[in-house]
Amino acid sequence: MPDKTRILVTNCNTTVAMTEEICAGARAAAGPGTEIVGLTPFWGPESAEGWVDSYLSAAAVLDLLRDVDEPFDALVMAGFGEHGREGARELLDVPVVDITEAAAHLACLLGRRYGVVTTLERSCGQIEDSLLTAGVAQHCAAVVATGLGVLELADEARALAAITAAGARARQAGAEVLVLGCAGMTRLVRTVASDLGMPVVDGVAAAVKLAESLVGLGLSTSRVGSYAKPLAKQRQWGLPPTTSQGCQGPARA
């Protein structure tokens, strides 16, 4: 294991304040020899809520990662239920830990069934699909929406009330452990656990600790089969090139 472990943490949206909040949670969980470096995509949605946002976010994060020129030992992807983790594993030669997967795996060590509390109802399907792909969906009792958008979580009192109510519904559905299904909920983990009287797993903290463990064990993504390096070919990244007439292509909203 290196003397100092450097972990990149990528926000899935363009809101810098949320990146800072995520990194504060990551640093609180990290060991004394770990440096946390936060990254915010240059383009994409201000908050990821729904399929369009998720796919746009994934492309923006991959576009960001391909140009990182500073050394790092692992990547934490801080978008709960968002797309892109498989692409990042192809792209990078270091361990890639997604907060959705990390939280679910740790929750399975603490109880037989876990529940997820998330933001809007429209995000539940994405989270269910992500858990299924990760192989941990069979232990999920429920994915429950709070009804709050990602940016609305900044109102701490309102967020706490909504998360606690959703957590109680997940417990009634059979959850023995609760997973916070948005990186913007990180700061509330201890209060929610106390209010509900059950273990609560924060995905950011879980992902950081798993990333540290993988680095310490000298393990990284397998290149056999699924996550082989991308094929060599021409790819057009980011914005479209200027046309031969010197004009940009059509504007996009």
For every predicted segment, state its role.
Residues 94-101, 137-143, 198-205, 221:
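Short hydrophobic/aromatic-enriched beta-strand-loop microsegments
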Residues 5-29:
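N-terminal beta1-alpha1 ligand-phosphate binding loop
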Residues 9-10, 72-79, 174-183:
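Periplasmic-binding protein-like
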Residues 125-183, 188:
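Active-site rim beta-loop-alpha module in soluble metabolic enzymes
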Residues 32, 91-94, 110, 139, ...:
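Short, structured coil segments at secondary-structure junctions
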Residues 38-62, 151-156:
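N-terminal beta-loop-helix "entrance" segment that forms/cooperates
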Residues 58-112, 116:
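Glycine/small-residue-rich loop that forms an oxyanion/phosphate-binding "nest" at active or ligand-binding sites
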Residues 17, 108-146, 157-158, 213-253:
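Short, glycine-/small-residue-rich phosphate/pyrophosphate-handling segment
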